[in-house]
Amino acid sequence: MPLSYQHFRKLLLLDDEAGPLEEELPRLADEDLNRRVAEDLNLGNLNVSIPWTHKVGNFTGLYSSTVPVFNPEWQTPSFPHIHLQEDIINRCQQYVGPLTVNEKRRLKLIMPARFYPKLTKYLPLDKGIKPYYPEHAVNHYFKTRHYLHTLWKAGILYKRETTRSASFCGSPYSWEQELQHGRLVFQTSTRHGDESFCSQSSGILSRSPVGPCVRSQLKQSRLGLQPQQGSLARGKSGRSGSIRARVPPTTRRSFGVEPSGSGHIDNRASSTSSCLHQSAVRKTAYSHLSTSKRQSSSGHAVELHHISPSPARSQSEGPIFSSWWLQFRNSKPCSDYCLTHIVNLLEDWGPCTEHGEHNIRIPRTPARVTGGVFLVDKNPHNTTESRLVVDFSQFSRGSTHVSWPKFAVPNLQSLTNLLSSNLSWLSLDVSAAFYHIPLHPAAMPHLLVGSSGLPRYVARLSSTSRNINHQHGTMQDLHDSCSRNLYVSLLLLYKTFGRKLHLYSHPIILGFRKIPMGGGLSPFLLAQFTSAICSVVRRAFPHCLAFSYMDDVVLGAKSVQHLESLFTSITNFLLSLGIHLNPNKTKRWGYSLNFMGYVIGSWGTLPQEHIVLKIKQCFRKLPVNRPIDWKVCQRIVGLLGFAAPFTQCGYPALMPLYACIQSKQAFTFSPTYKAFLCKQYLHLYPVARRTALCQVFADATPTGWGLAIGHRRMRGTFVAPLPIHTAELLAACFARSRSGAKLIGTDNSVVLSRKYTSFPWLLGCAANWILRGTYFVYVPSALNPADDPSRGRLGLIRPLLHLRFRPTTGRTSLYAVSPSVPSHLPDRVHFASPLHVAWRPP
């Protein structure tokens, strides 16, 4: 007969009418009983023949995440001009006196941050924007391009101009100025011309000598023709990269080209569309180099669009436009939905490319990307704005993956010990926190994003792609991309972006100038940065408790008025360092702080309400007697595990689920086990912070146990010898139930760790409930007053130790040893400090 829930509760000693604990509890360690209960609850039956369930409520398997929804109305968020002050260490020292070694080291790590991957895999430009929304491909393309453009304008990205140069906006850092070769001078169009090939008059180029002269500028190599001068076409030409020098005289004009996006790595810049430092002659030469068909390593020829020259065309007809977009102006409409109609809406479509305010030399950077991008909702509560997702997961995968540095994450007990107090709280919102931290330009070639331009993107998405064929580019090829969908999309986007449609239809390659969110190193760097800043703030304002985790910064003070005055001073200090705060998102919490998914008050810590609701929904949807895919179980355990420390039986209650995940088998919930878990999560108990003097001690041997409660001594024996850790755990449970003490001295490290997941399942669950809210303090065996009773000797009474229990805060301690501060720095605010009143340093 299956085990009923009531019977199971009695067995686990969760009901009051259980027998004496000394008799009942050791039985739960019995292996035979644990096996029988597991069979009754269907916990051990992992091999099932029924099909697995792959979805429970919102939880799906690990590899089938929910499909993001595209919002055509997405707004691109605006980014302030973020420029973290380079002399941040000096500024902090002026404010607070000498910095600690720790603070200095952390701040030096991010000024500038460096990134050294073992191996970088370069992907074709086609993979730059991920085709996440096939229904809205064009819309997604332009919105993503606009987002990237916004980031570049805000100084967060570099734009690759040539293989070895990039431009950027915003204030340069000293390590960038060392690498500059002068600013772009926009008037001198021969060197740094802002006009790109679209707007070049045909007059200059039509008289340029072509033919033998072109050959003379290029030297033959085994890779085909190579330029002798730097910026003509650095990098390897493809297998068919020879230049067709036999050009009819009438074609001596500049033809445009969209550089090929897939294929061999040739380190051309955005090819002819970016202005290289070339003379008119070399521009002509390069235009022929570009228009020749190149064979790509992926096996198909990449067709580059250009206008077939007609001998009848006279010089007086004006310039031939080289841009894919502008070529439509001179062509006849192919249908009602031809792009010619859109291109003719405007006379001036602006330049093909934009240049940044500053130019910089960079390590050799190929015309490729190293990660894809796509857009999603900014967060579940804000669907009007978009967020750019950058996938640099190549650095975290495979045999060449980078081992990212570990950093301290405060656990629940540490957080409670630090923040559970009667302080008044507020949290600061750092806007675009990741984009505060500058990256060294040497990291740019590893962190590239971009796009191959609209024609290639559209061609790649249409399955019947006629753009990529093995013939020469003709006028017909130009119109191959015309379609009703594209026409309608572009017409709608024209209202939003206007003449920028032209700019965004060109290819672009961008490298990160500030740390990207998708890089594995970024969380570590952000954690170092904010923790160092908070450490400085705590010493500048000794009456304020400042604490941070990633970009979440909280301030605590004794009263609301005090908190407000601190808030003003600290905000000004952070702004002086170049840290951007979002004043609209400052949250005032009163005495209950919401932080990292917890509510923390003077009474202790509990999970936030939205997590409790999620758990209730999860149980409502949880099927009984149906095998659930172990990947879904991982999701369920993730949610339940977060709140496990607040339940009666804690983590041990979830052990059967952990076991099934480890063995990669499906898990079947029996009605009793589900009811047991439901009841566990119905009543959550706060985790609290305590300090006390230890008066109760427990010890055990495999055959017996002993307690010292004040001046009383007790002992008992086990029916059968037990493993030493199990015996020590039982002794601790007896000490708690006999004395009611919240603080117990023990010499066993496993009991001390309070992780009872390795014990027999039933015992682990029961012990977790009995020892809830109990704290342990380590006492060496030789000094343990309970040592003699556990060995059966009651006559000898060792003196009780005066052991004060101080809550630990793990590696997230607040107390930096403060160097001596010069006397001329006045106290900021004269209030009793919470660190001295409400706090005893751990």
From Swiss-Prot:
Residues 1-177 are annotated as: Terminal protein domain (TP). GO terms for biological process: DNA replication; symbiont-mediated suppression of host innate immune response. InterPro entries: DNA/RNA_pol_sf (IPR043502), DNApol_viral_C (IPR001462), DNApol_viral_N (IPR000201), HBV_DPOL (IPR037531), Rev_trsase/Diguanyl_cyclase (IPR043128), RT_dom (IPR000477), Viral_Replic_Matur_Polypro (IPR051320). Belongs to the hepadnaviridae P protein family. It catalyses: DNA(n) + a 2'-deoxyribonucleoside 5'-triphosphate = DNA(n+1) + diphosphate; Endonucleolytic cleavage to 5'-phosphomonoester. Mg(2+) binds at D429, D551, D552. This is Protein P. Residues 178-346 are annotated as: Spacer. One of its GO terms (molecular function) is DNA binding. Residues 218-274 are annotated as: Disordered. The record marks Y63 as: Priming of reverse-transcription by covalently linking the first nucleotide of the (-)DNA.
